[in-house]
């Protein structure tokens, strides 16, 4: 059986893992085995939190819309239902930005919806 020399491949792999772990604290950024474990954990956390971020922002938009609609005597569910009946197709993100940044435009939306 022939001898397999993998020094370059192994070094490249270890260097790649240690580069990914460069911002970690303590031995997690210096020792290969702990760095490998921590990078796997960090990558799984980052994947999970990218999904969670979407849910949290959606909840934030709903909360903002509910607060803004209550100033005009509506709640979020009635506001959304009346928007749908009026044929206004704006998503939660855009509606919350309008409510936050442009009070007059949001008030016009409320007047359209209330009638």
UniProtKB/Swiss-Prot annotation:
Subcellular location: Plastid, Chloroplast
Highest taxon listed in the record's lineage: Eukaryota
Keywords associated with the record: Chloroplast, Plastid, Ribonucleoprotein, Ribosomal protein, RNA-binding, rRNA-binding
Single GO biological process annotation from the record: translation
Intrachain disulfide bonds: none
Entry GO MF terms: rRNA binding; structural constituent of ribosome
Coiled-coil residue windows: none
GO cellular component: chloroplast; ribonucleoprotein complex; ribosome
UniProt keyword rRNA processing present: no
SUPFAM superfamilies xrefs: Ribosomal protein L20 (SSF74731)
Function: Binds directly to 23S ribosomal RNA and is necessary for the in vitro assembly process of the 50S ribosomal subunit. It is not involved in the protein synthesizing functions of that subunit.
Family: Belongs to the bacterial ribosomal protein bL20 family.
Name of the protein in question: Large ribosomal subunit protein bL20c
Natural source organism: Chlorella vulgaris
